């Protein structure tokens, strides 16, 4: 797809050859052919309906769980802005959340409304759209535990509300169709005291700060935990703590995190991940699966 291709008219913002490195946590990777920031759901649905179906579409949240390859993304990247970031209680235990709302906003709104069970979202560095797509989870909670339903715009531009059962959730995976964009979700918790909810959020924050390289350029958890194992322990046992490829390094603080030490390319980061997978397979016989999404084309 060329940046001169004719795209449907929009009311939001459409940027050709948009650099993606500033928008992802690793701060590496190439440009998107187009970056689309829709004004509202109608704008998004109309655009996808009229867009050539051969053009790939990818939703981008906070860019935390993502490697964008150095050749960029050959298609349209959709980024939901403030119009999609609202969170509001709809009853004593239920929140209605926009697809662009952060986990921090959802969990703090739940706290203020006295809704427990969503504290774990405080620790997920992403948006509702991202963690609904991948059944995000941490600290004993997963999206499947709180999701009632979600609103999506399919690649065809059709709008649909999908119930929890429609998503086919497994560990860090859903059956959400390719090119679909999650524009909203309904989460249900349980009644709780705001002070106790805040205390649990504080505990989670302190645990993350102590154990994860939060101030580094990282993508979050790199590999899924295999059944009965912790990925970080397998990586450590294979001698990969501190291992480097180019400017990419396995974190000394938490071995299931890769970090960009300053000048890493996405190729460095992905190659490091593959080298870790190879060493773990050689050491333990276990084949680690990527949790981080890798998209786009190599340079």
Swiss-Prot record:
Catalytic reaction annotation: UDP-N-acetyl-alpha-D-muramate + NADP(+) = UDP-N-acetyl-3-O-(1-carboxyvinyl)-alpha-D-glucosamine + NADPH + H(+)
Enzyme class name: oxidoreductase
Pfam family, one: FAD_binding_4
Compartments, record wording: Cytoplasm
A GO cellular-component term linked to this record: cytosol
Active site: 172, 221, 291
Domain of life the protein comes from: Bacteria
Keyword annotations of the record: Cell cycle, Cell division, Cell shape, Cell wall biogenesis/degradation, Cytoplasm, FAD, Flavoprotein, NADP, Oxidoreductase, Peptidoglycan synthesis
Cofactor(s) the record lists: FAD
Family per record: Belongs to the MurB family.
The protein, known as: UDP-N-acetylenolpyruvoylglucosamine reductase
Species assigned in the record: Sphingopyxis alaskensis (strain DSM 13593 / LMG 18877 / RB2256) (Sphingomonas alaskensis)
Taxon lineage: Bacteria, Pseudomonadati, Pseudomonadota, Alphaproteobacteria, Sphingomonadales
């Amino acid at each position: 797809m060329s940046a001169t291709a004719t795209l449907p008219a929009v009311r939001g913002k459409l940027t050709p050859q948009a650099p993606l490195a500033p928008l992802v946590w690793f701060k590496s990777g190439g440009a998107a052919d187009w970056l689309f920031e829709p004004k509202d759901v109608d704008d998004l649905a109309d655009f996808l309906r009229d867009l050539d179906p051969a053009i790939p579409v990818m939703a981008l949240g906070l860019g935390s769980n993502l490697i964008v390859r150095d050749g960029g993304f050959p298609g349209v990247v959709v980024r939901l802005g403030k119009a999609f970031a609202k969170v509001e209680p709809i009853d004593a235990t239920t929140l209605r959340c926009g697809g662009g709302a952060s986990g921090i906003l959802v969990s703090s709104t739940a706290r203020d409304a006295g809704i427990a069970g969503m504290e774990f979202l405080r620790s997920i560095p992403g948006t509702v759209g991202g963690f609904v797509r991948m059944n995000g989870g941490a600290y004993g909670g997963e999206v499947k535990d709180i999701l009632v339903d979600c609103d999506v715009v399919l690649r065809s531009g059709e709008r649909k509300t999908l119930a929890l059962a429609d998503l086919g959730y497994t560990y860090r995976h859903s059956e959400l169709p390719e090119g679909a964009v999650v524009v909203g979700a309904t989460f249900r918790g349980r009644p709780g005291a705001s002070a106790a909810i805040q205390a649990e959020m504080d505990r989670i924050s302190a645990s993350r700060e102590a154990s994860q390289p939060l101030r580094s350029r990282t993508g979050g958890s790199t590999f899924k935990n295999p059944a009965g194992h912790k990925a970080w322990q397998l990586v450590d046992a294979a001698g990969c703590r501190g291992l480097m490829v180019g400017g990419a390094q396995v974190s000394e603080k938490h071995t299931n995190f890769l970090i960009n030490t300053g000048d890493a390319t996405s190729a460095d980061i992905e190659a490091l991940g593959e080298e870790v997978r190879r060493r773990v397979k050689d050491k333990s016989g276990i084949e680690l699966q990527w949790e981080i999404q890798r998209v786009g084309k190599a340079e």
